């Protein structure tokens, strides 16, 4: 499962700078939607072959009131659920009382912690960092997050235990990525069959108290009592195998404590990190929205993370019963206005409590998964690419027309289309969005985003010594030189 890195430290030590540097390396086109708000505290990062969730826990001042009382509840949860903690300090400001208080808390939690001395640019770093050894948390790592110095080395070192699971070699390179190779027809068919035979992993996500617990129990059956308030279950989600009409599912539970007989009395435990990890590990995301509260910023944040991860998506607007027609019309209008950028996703209006509309969710879940794992031939993808060029030619780049040559499938779930050509990486984002939308319309993809990768064609003469002429070229060159000399004499 994808590791979680928590950035911890007092205010103004550079946590946000490092967070922004790590998260903006993930530039998949699928996340480039207008109107989509991004959560400033949780992000998906990709650096040096490692993929991980990074969490900015916010500033902790460590006052005399006690470190526990000064830390936000979500910050404490982030530290508890993180696999790696980067304890950031300010090398210029030196060791402070707040640093000591934070270190004491981290020592008590026995988390895998790395002390990072930030802002070492332009100073004697070794001297400035010496006092941080007294924190008793091991080696002190130097970094200048604003300039990017030491960032990659820090991530490689701190996430080294996860390298084997991610297929990363000792030289820091990962295995050949899906988009760097072209599937043969046999490989594509075998991969599609493998995916279709697997159970659909479904993550039901949403902000607290939107009805995730009620819906999960409705899906599992009312007679089933589900209690997950046990040691060891607070960190990872629960995986529940189930079957419906011959189709196997694995339900990823993120709701926390739930007892069927006391579902109305139990306050749902909500963990952002648990939810994000479930999104990374699932095939289809079922996002629950509360009809009575409308679309909240937290809903958009979860939606953004699901799109970043390239997951197939179904939206369920819960608590639809019991509200009058005027409110229903207003909610539908808001959905059209704020969720227009995900018009590929099915939206259902349900009542998890009474079961209204729940059965139809399965149809959309299976439809979304089938779209995400559908096999499309290279010839079909290339033909669609050519049709897109005919409708809207690529722009000029440095006075030359960008040429698109061919396209092929680069992966499934999410579907990845790799377009090869000349100067394609210089294409403006507007044209890339045009291509993505064109493929989605042409393939009639429902319930899943499409990712488009662009690869420049290689130079077949690269690495060759073109200055050395062959024997026949030398002869022709001598004849030409002689001809020119004779002409000049005349």
Curated annotation (Swiss-Prot):
Domain KH-like per the UniProt entry, residue ranges: 374-458
EngA-type G domain ranges (all copies): 3-166, 200-373
Residues reported to bind GTP 1: 9-16, 56-60, 118-121
Entry's Gene Ontology BP terms: ribosome biogenesis
Positions that bind GTP 2: 206-213, 253-257, 318-321
Keywords: GTP-binding, Nucleotide-binding, Repeat, Ribosome biogenesis
One example GO MF annotation: ribosome binding
Described purpose of this protein according to its UniProt entry: GTPase that plays an essential role in the late steps of ribosome biogenesis.
Subunit structure, as described in the record: Associates with the 50S ribosomal subunit.
HAMAP family referenced in this protein's UniProt entry, alphabetically: GTPase_Der
Protein name, as recorded: GTPase Der
Phylogenetic lineage: Bacteria, Pseudomonadati, Pseudomonadota, Gammaproteobacteria, Alteromonadales
């Amino acid at each position: 499962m994808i590791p979680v890195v928590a950035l911890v430290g007092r205010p103004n030590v550079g946590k946000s700078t490092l967070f922004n540097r790590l998260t903006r390396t993930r530039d998949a086109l699928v996340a480039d939607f207008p109107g989509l708000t991004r959560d400033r505290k949780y992000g998906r990062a990709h650096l040096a072959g490692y993929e991980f969730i990074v969490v900015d826990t916010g500033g902790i001042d460590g006052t005399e009131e006690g470190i526990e009382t000064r830390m936000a509840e979500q910050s404490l949860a982030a530290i508890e659920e993180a696999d790696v903690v980067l304890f950031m300090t300010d090398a210029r400001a030196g060791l402070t009382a707040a640093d000591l208080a934070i270190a004491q808390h981290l020592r008590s939690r026995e988390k895998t912690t790395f002390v990072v001395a930030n802002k070492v640019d332009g100073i004697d770093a070794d001297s400035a960092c010496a006092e941080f050894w007294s924190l008793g948390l091991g080696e002190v790592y130097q970094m200048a997050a604003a300039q990017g110095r030491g960032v990659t080395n820090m991530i490689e070192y701190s996430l080294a235990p996860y390298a084997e699971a991610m297929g990363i070699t000792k030289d820091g390179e990962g295995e050949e990525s899906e988009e760097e190779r072209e599937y043969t027809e046999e490989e594509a068919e075998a991969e599609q069959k493998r995916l279709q035979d697997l159970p659909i992993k479904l993550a039901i996500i949403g902000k607290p108290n939107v009805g995730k617990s009620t819906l999960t129990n409705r899906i599992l059956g009312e007679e089933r009592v589900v209690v997950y308030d046990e040691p060891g279950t607070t960190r990872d989600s629960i995986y529940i195998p189930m079957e419906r009409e011959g189709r196997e599912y694995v339900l990823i539970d993120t709701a926390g404590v739930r007892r069927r007989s006391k579902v109305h009395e139990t306050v749902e435990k909500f963990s952002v990190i648990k939810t994000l990890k479930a999104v990374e590990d699932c095939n289809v995301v079922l996002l629950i929205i509360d009809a009575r509260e409308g679309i909240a910023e937290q809903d958009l944040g979860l939606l953004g993370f699901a799109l970043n991860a390239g997951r197939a998506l179904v939206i369920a607007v819960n608590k639809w019963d019991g509200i009058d027609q005027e409110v229903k019309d207003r909610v539908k209008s808001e959905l059209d206005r704020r969720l227009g950028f995900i018009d590929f996703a099915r939206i259902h209006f349900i009542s998890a409590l009474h079961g209204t509309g729940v059965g139809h969710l399965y149809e959309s879940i299976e439809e979304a998964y089938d779209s995400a794992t559908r096999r499309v031939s290279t010839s079909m993808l290339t033909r669609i690419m050519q049709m897109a060029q005919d409708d809207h030619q690529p722009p000029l780049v440095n006075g030359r027309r960008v040429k698109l040559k061919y396209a092929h499938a680069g992966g499934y779930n999410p579907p990845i289309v790799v377009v090869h050509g000349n100067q394609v990486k210089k294409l403006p984002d507007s044209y890339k969005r045009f291509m993505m939308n064109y493929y989605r319309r042409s393939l009639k993809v429902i319930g899943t985003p499409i990712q488009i990768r662009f690869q420049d064609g290689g130079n077949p003469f690269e690495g060759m010594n073109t200055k050395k002429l062959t024997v026949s070229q030398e002869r022709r060159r001598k004849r030409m030189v002689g001809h020119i000399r004779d002409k000049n004499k005349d």
